[in-house]
């Protein structure tokens, strides 16, 4: 339980810093002349760098341990937020998201840390704890960012810098290493073959499709939403901060308390299916909502759907994988998700520049296709013993069940 708490607070502080810039970013980008495609590019490049970092940092953490990877990325995050605070042009803002996106790849190390300290039976609950840290970070961060913006455009970024440095100092003293030296493996850091291996497994393929399409649709939605809300409902940083706070509080409540109870009753597969279709409807109705109150209400439905989907999908990846390849498959899923988050923002942003309504309908349709893919998932296999988690396979793994 103590180790759960340590990684929870490490991820929490990291995500508060991330959440601080969320309600500021679309208006910051518009200040430099960015429309749908330009803002989508800022969001997409963050995920592109997260994809690169996910491929690198998960394997690097297998080689040198989780702790040094997490500590180093906290310092890199501070650099990215410094650039954000003092961005004087679109391209400096773009560069700041490149740096922060690379640091954001540390989530693979954080999830591997949680997997190291849990048994397969506890793994979905452990991922729910990480998800709760996301939720609370998204609750607190946007509120802090919206408040800090009253003190100047640099203030939110500087607060995020301070939090990143504070996170580094606290983690340096309280975050122990979770991966024993004898379990560490040296592999090529930029070998992306694990993505193809995961997709090639019939048992895993539908889940990999879900992992690609859900982030694509959701990330595209996050580009269209603030632009539409500003144009149609007159939203500013305050209103957007409230929306992100609703998402964060809901995620923290669902993943931190309710998810463990729900997943034991209905299972991960059912939650993945329900979550994708719930998000599809909540996204598609947005351009037809005439008031902020209705948009906030549907945001709650979206947040509940996403909050049950995310840890359930992560848990399914873990239990579907071969015992000595769990980290490999989890890393592949994270990388595929990052590619979806890279493609979604410029795609939906470009469509938004042509038609706001079409952008939401497209994002909702993509989410619905993900739901159909989830229907084809095989029953969850049984696992009986804890296994070490890596982001690269062991030499000569046993054949898969596929």
Locations of the language-model features?
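Cytoplasmic helix-loop-helix junction between adjacent transmembrane helices
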Residues: 96-135
């Amino acid at each position: 339980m103590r180790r759960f708490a340590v990684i929870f607070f490490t991820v929490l502080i990291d995500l508060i810093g991330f959440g601080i810039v969320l309600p500021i970013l679309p208006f910051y980008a518009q200040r430099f002349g960015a429309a749908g495609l330009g803002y989508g590019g800022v969001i997409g490049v963050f995920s592109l760098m997260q994809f690169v970092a996910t491929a690198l940092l998960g394997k690097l953490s297998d080689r040198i341990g989780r702790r040094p990877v997490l500590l180093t990325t906290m310092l890199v995050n501070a650099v990215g937020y410094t650039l954000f605070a003092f961005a004087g042009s679109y391209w400096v803002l773009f560069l700041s998201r490149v740096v922060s996106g690379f640091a954001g790849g540390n989530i693979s190390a954080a999830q591997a840390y949680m997997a190291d300290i849990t048994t397969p039976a506890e793994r979905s609950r452990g991922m729910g704890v990480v998800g709760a840290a996301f939720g609370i970070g998204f609750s607190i961060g946007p509120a802090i960012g919206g408040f800090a913006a009253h003190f100047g455009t640099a203030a939110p970024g500087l607060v995020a810098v301070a939090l990143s440095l504070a996170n580094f100092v606290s983690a340096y003293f309280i975050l122990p290493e979770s991966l024993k030296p004898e379990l560490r493996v040296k592999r090529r850091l930029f070998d992306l073959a694990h993505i193809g291996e995961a997709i090639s497994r019939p048992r895993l393929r539908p889940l990999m499709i879900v992992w690609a399409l859900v982030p694509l649709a959701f990330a595209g939605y996050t580009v269209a939403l603030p632009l539409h809300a500003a144009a149609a409902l007159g939203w500013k940083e305050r209103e957007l901060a409230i929306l992100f706070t609703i998402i964060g509080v809901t995620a923290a409540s669902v993943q931190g308390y309710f998810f463990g109870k729900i997943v034991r009753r209905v299972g991960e597969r059912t939650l993945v299916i329900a979550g994708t279709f719930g998000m599809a409807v909540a996204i598609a109705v947005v351009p037809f909502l005439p008031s902020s109150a209705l948009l906030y209400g549907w945001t709650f439905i979206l947040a509940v759907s996403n909050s049950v989907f995310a840890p359930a999908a992560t848990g399914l990846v873990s239990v579907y994988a071969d015992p000595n390849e769990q980290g490999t498959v989890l890393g592949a899923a994270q990388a595929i998700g990052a590619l979806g988050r890279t493609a979604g923002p410029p795609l939906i942003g470009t469509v938004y520049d042509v038609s706001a309504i079409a952008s939401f309908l497209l994002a909702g349709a993509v989410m619905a296709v993900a739901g159909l893919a989830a229907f084809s998932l095989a029953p969850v296999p049984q696992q009986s013993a804890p296994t070490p988690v890596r982001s690269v396979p062991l030499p000569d793994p046993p054949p898969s069940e596929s």
